[in-house]
Amino acid sequence: VNKKLRALIDDMAETMYKTEGVGLAAPQVAVAKRIIVVDDQSGSGLIALINPEITHAEGSQVGPEGCLSVPGYFGDVERFNKVTVKGIDPHNKKVTIKAEGFLARIFQHEIDHLEGHLFIEKATNLRLITDHPEEKEIV
């Protein structure tokens, strides 16, 4: 992992925090690299992974998701409740992370971006939240 890659990770984290997101994948900022940054706001801090992959998944959860790439849209998405993710951290160390609940959801959402998928492909009850008091049903 070189300085240029670390700078990209720093920029991605800054973008994620400025937009009040909990995750960001490199393709969302027009970079064709397999990098994600994640912070589930539980106090454990930023997680940055290069070449992340889900090596184990179990259970099921359905919950609401939105995305910085599809502003204003929200929908319910079924995801695994527990995942094991392997990747390389910014210090060039191989890491394995076991996540469940919200953090597991974020990992799956961001890794989907690396595979060219958006949450709206999996969402039910997709809706557009506007500045108006009513919600607009899409699907």
Where are these regions (language model features)?
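Positively charged
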Residues: 1-139
